Amino acid sequence: MEKAIVLLSAGLDSTVSLAYGVRNFQVVLGLTFNYGQKASRKEIEHSKKILDYYGIPQEVIELPFLKKITKTSLVAEDQEIPTGIDLESAAAVKTSMEKVWVPNRNGLFINIAAAYAESLGAKYIITGFNAEEAKTFSDNSREFVDAVNHALKYSTLNHVQVVSFTQNLEKSEIYRLGVELGAPLDLIWSCYYGGDEMCGVCESCLRLKRARGGN
């Protein structure tokens, strides 16, 4: 089996992509990032539980500078994350995206992961992108992955490549796939906040609720 590493936030997409990936690759490391996001503690904690479930070691990458230069509500303590938005409204979803956008976040994550992958002799980086959010988050899109993979052919000697087994799926399809794969869906954290429980009203929580069929 080819070696791979996984970028894991403990959300639905990355967890299910990992569940699929372990059937195809030898996953040797999980990377979780702390860039000052409000859910960082929960993402790290739940990612560790998911990685432990699969017997994969975790490394937490600290990126404090990203919080310093980012002004959006995902990290800024003086800004409220949008809640209760209408997921069927393109305008509302676009506004929500702009309020939680972190500059080049996925680009940074992937390039850091590529350095780890090459050093570990791994050819693949497993990520959790999806078709639903790619409509507003351009760094979830197939075009983004294709562009990054083109660049990685030049920046890594072993031509590390990004793969996402959820890339072409809507959230509801990803949830069903997770059930089929026996993914530890009880361990996921899909909330923008870091409270004791998921808030249930931020965009990420609303998408998870809809994916579950309203439950």
Curated annotation (Swiss-Prot):
Gene Ontology process terms (BP): queuosine biosynthetic process
Cofactor remark from the record: Binds 1 zinc ion per subunit.
The UniProt record lists the keyword Manganese: no
Top-level division of the source organism's lineage: Bacteria
Positions of transmembrane segments: none
GO molecular function: ATP binding; ligase activity, forming carbon-nitrogen bonds; zinc ion binding
Keywords: ATP-binding, Ligase, Metal-binding, Nucleotide-binding, Queuosine biosynthesis, Zinc
Obligatory cofactor(s): Zn(2+)
Annotated metabolic or biological route of this protein: Purine metabolism; 7-cyano-7-deazaguanine biosynthesis
Catalysed reaction equations from the record: 7-carboxy-7-deazaguanine + NH4(+) + ATP = 7-cyano-7-deazaguanine + ADP + phosphate + H2O + H(+)
UniProt: ATP binding residues: L8, S9, A10, G11, L12, D13, S14, T15, V16, S17, L18
Entry binding sites for Zn(2+): C191, C199, C202, C205
EC number: 6.3.4.20
Annotated Gene3D superfamilies: HUPs
Quaternary assembly: Homodimer.
Function of the protein: Catalyzes the ATP-dependent conversion of 7-carboxy-7-deazaguanine (CDG) to 7-cyano-7-deazaguanine (preQ(0)).
NCBIfam families per record: 7-cyano-7-deazaguanine synthase QueC
HAMAP family per record: QueC
Record-stated family: Belongs to the QueC family.
Name of the protein: 7-cyano-7-deazaguanine synthase
Species, as recorded: Carboxydothermus hydrogenoformans (strain ATCC BAA-161 / DSM 6008 / Z-2901)
Organism taxonomic ancestry: Bacteria, Bacillati, Bacillota, Clostridia, Thermoanaerobacterales
